[in-house]
Amino acid sequence: MQIDYLARHDHFLTESARRHFAEWSHSWPGDTVEARAKRLRLRGGNGAIPSVFVAFEGPALCGSAGLIQNYLPNRPNLEPWLAGVYVTPSMRRQGIGTALVSAVQNEARRRDITRLYRCSATAERYHACRGWVVLERLHRRGELQAVIILDLVLA
């Protein structure tokens, strides 16, 4: 398996957008696959914020994860964010998500970022086992979500 910037593997853009849409469209009323693809293209990155990483094996897309500047507009002091962590269902529990999250953390460290934030309704326990701490819980897009933080100096 390889992990690299989506910007270097544009052929995964449409499939990534389809998968993100299928996973999260319930939280984004009015969203479309095309709009997702446009956002992913803008976030494709290549050593910058925002950046999207893809995990792949040959022609098979395994997953993706991103580093974005801000996820919660009403909390501009919380930045940057690990976002859009997605692993193909048939490939879960094989370390792909962990590898993608590590790629984002390493990108942040290269940019001298000392902490990362994440908002999730489903992955709080997963991240807690890896050093992330709950900062707050909030209702967002119809779900109770945890805003979590990772100190990259200690991690």
Regions found by a protein language model. Name each.
Residues 101, 108-121:
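Conserved GNAT acetyl-CoA-binding A-motif
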Residues 118-123, 136-155:
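C-terminal "cap" of GNAT-fold acetyltransferases
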Residues 1-16:
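A short beta-loop-alpha structural element at the N-terminal edge
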Residues 50, 77, 82, 143:
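Short coil/loop residues immediately preceding or within conserved phosphate-binding loops
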Residues 128-138:
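Conserved acetyl-CoA-binding loop of GNAT-fold acetyltransferases
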Residues 25-54, 62:
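Active-site rim helix/loop that mediates acceptor-substrate recognition in acyltransferases
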Residues 52-54, 60-70, 81, 86:
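Conserved beta-strand in the GNAT
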Residues 84-87, 93-106, 129:
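Conserved acetyl-CoA-binding loop-helix of GNAT-fold acetyltransferases
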